[in-house]
Amino acid sequence: MHPNVPAWRLSAAALLLALAALPAAAADKPCNDAGKSIDGVTTWAALAKAMHDYGHCDKGPTAEVFTEAILRVIISGWPKIADAGPILEKDAAFKNWLAKRLSSPDLSPQDTAEIRDLAKASCPKGQDKVCGELLSSVEMGRAISSPDLLLLQPLTPAPAPAKKP
């Protein structure tokens, strides 16, 4: 068919419309299996895969299961924190999603404190970048949930003005 033939234009338009709908349909895995799949996550690779498979379901009860998985991978899996580096470096979408989740004011103060303490005091050798990214995210969340933390007081009082003789 030739592009000037009206039937060709209609066929091309229908094809483009069908192709435009494919990515959206492929990205939307049903959320009814999300909780079960995410609940079994224990590694950084599995967490990244779960985010890609079910990130669109990250709300309501599924968000709670995602939070539990994140905490399980970071806190319980701290000895394997080195596995996070290559994944965070290669997968910007996962890195941004994780930073957003860790900086959420919905994360409990106890959990953010535990992640902060691990990142500050127990960062394995060579993992400074990963620890810094985790620390930065949870600190951002603390600042959002407790804005008074942003009101820093000077460490020493300002010097008194010099007296004129």
Segments from the language model and where they lie:
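Bacterial N-terminal signal peptides that target proteins for export
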Residues: 2-12
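Hydrophobic helical h-region of N-terminal Sec-dependent signal peptides
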Residues: 13-17
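N-terminal signal peptide c-region/cleavage motif recognized by signal peptidases
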Residues: 21-23
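N-terminal secretory signal peptides
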Residues: 27-67
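Extended alpha-helical scaffolding segments
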Residues: 59-149
